[in-house]
Amino acid sequence: MCEEEDSTALVCDNGSGLCKAGFAGDDAPRAVFPSIVGRPRHQGVMVGMGQKDSYVGDEAQSKRGILTLKYPIEHGIITNWDDMEKIWHHSFYNELRVAPEEHPTLLTEAPLNPKANREKMTQIMFETFNVPAMYVAIQAVLSLYASGRTTGIVLDSGDGVTHNVPIYEGYALPHAIMRLDLAGRDLTDYLMKILTERGYSFVTTAEREIVRDIKEKLCYVALDFENEMATAASSSSLEKSYELPDGQVITIGNERFRCPETLFQPSFIGMESAGIHETTYNSIMKCDIDIRKDLYANNVLSGGTTMYPGIADRMQKEITALAPSTMKIKIIAPPERKYSVWIGGSILASLSTFQQMWISKQEYDEAGPSIVHRKCF
């Protein structure tokens, strides 16, 4: 450890799919690992192998063939606290190799996170990890910080949940936040389903990870879905091949854009919800008429599920069709948007003006977990 890191703040962004952790002031997270806890499916027979009863992150991923994988964060909200503790423990001690009792820690949470959840996070940080100070920030707000803005509407779509969060002068407007339980994991499941129609079978939790890789490498968003379907039907120009871990090669055609099209047409997976372009528009329409212009001009994309090629152009086209014809519409898709929540946290935690915002151990001891509602908004 170098000297200046003796009390640097830690930033830990816990997503449904990936946990991003690192030091405030850095421009990227040091540790990015899957938010997975795996437990063996079989009885250990070899003595002295040092088999553990649970594995976290990349180690769970690499041994996935013999484990049952569980995600403690579902739809952006922590549902399994014991496993979550394992993930935090892993990120502090194994990934960052720090003692959490020496570092103020910034955590992130989903918009509209249940109150009891923030309290529980606060309690675990102070009582289990003995942090000297902590803060809980809303993910979408951090993404906006990372893009250098204080006003805009963020479309934050990760592995477990998608949110539209309008923010004005640094304040999220809770009445206009839209939540859509459709994100990367659902797209992976949908891709598994449509690949099955092609005769490729993917079923286990381990095979799902292979499909996720196919999705990340080959999928894209079509500007005009019907046109693209016609092109795919009449020629093989859109086909790509992918080599599976066992050497078998599979071909994928219109699945490449049918999979992410679900974001715009959730009916593909039997959801009654509006697509991401409509939820963005609805969210803007719930805001005060005077600030809508600023929101239309600052549509910020964030999260791994906004990484599909073509998504920004398609959003531009769809929102232009919904909005008043004279409105200037701008979609901002920063190249580092996969990690923009973490980057925003890194910026926030290293601001000198932020230092009085931390919840200190002393304040926690005096007021208890509910302090988090007063200090973090």
Curated annotation (Swiss-Prot):
SMART domains: ACTIN. The modification N6-methyllysine is found at K86. The keyword Nuclease does not apply. This is Actin, aortic smooth muscle. Keywords: Acetylation, Aortic aneurysm, ATP-binding, Cytoplasm, Cytoskeleton, Disease variant, Hydrolase, Isopeptide bond, Methylation, Muscle protein, Nucleotide-binding, Oxidation. It is linked to ACTA2 mutations predispose patients to a variety of diffuse and diverse vascular diseases, premature onset coronary artery disease (CAD), premature ischemic strokes and Moyamoya disease. The modification Methionine (R)-sulfoxide is found at M46, M49. The modification N-acetylglutamate is found at E3. It catalyses: ATP + H2O = ADP + phosphate + H(+). GO terms for molecular function: ATP binding; hydrolase activity; protein kinase binding. The gene is ACTA2. PROSITE patterns: ACTINS_1, ACTINS_2, ACTINS_ACT_LIKE. Belongs to the actin family.
